Amino acid sequence: MQLTSFGCGPDAFMTGEVQTLLRNHGKNLTLLKIDDVNNTGSLKLRVRSLVESLRTKAEETKNCKSDTVSLPPYTEKHAGRKIIVPFFTPFISPLIPSLMKLAGYNVENLPMSDNASCDWGLKYSNNEICYPATLVVGDIMKAFKSGAYNPDTTCVAMVQTGGQCRASNYFSLIRKALMEG
């Protein structure tokens, strides 16, 4: 059971990760958004439903095995592969392929996000994450689903802020979408 007070930002990223971990072990996530309601009746109902489902499911999950899959890291053997990056801004994105070419990388910007990006992002990510994260996931999935990029010979690059920005959590969303897609 996860309690959340808002369901956006870090909560949304954590919810997606917890849900995946639990699903890999044959369990379900019960999410209680404590700011969603003034009446606690629905929260009590969810808790009672959780308790009942735990009773009936206890025997089923004893022999459950996890099928954890990971994406390979980019190494020297991948040199020369196409690397796609989401469109960041009209000021920075045009510079990325040229700068990365100087470092020996074959980088291509994805086009700016559109309505289809949003649709793909909603399909492959937690729909409570921030809108920019939905678009980034959608841009990447749209690119691969278009057939223009071979998943066996194309890599995805994404920035990591290492700080408090939610962009630090995009990697886990992208990874999950690629594995599910």
Predicted segments, located by residue:
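An N-terminal assembly and electron-transfer interface module characteristic of large anaerobic redox
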Residues: Q2-G181
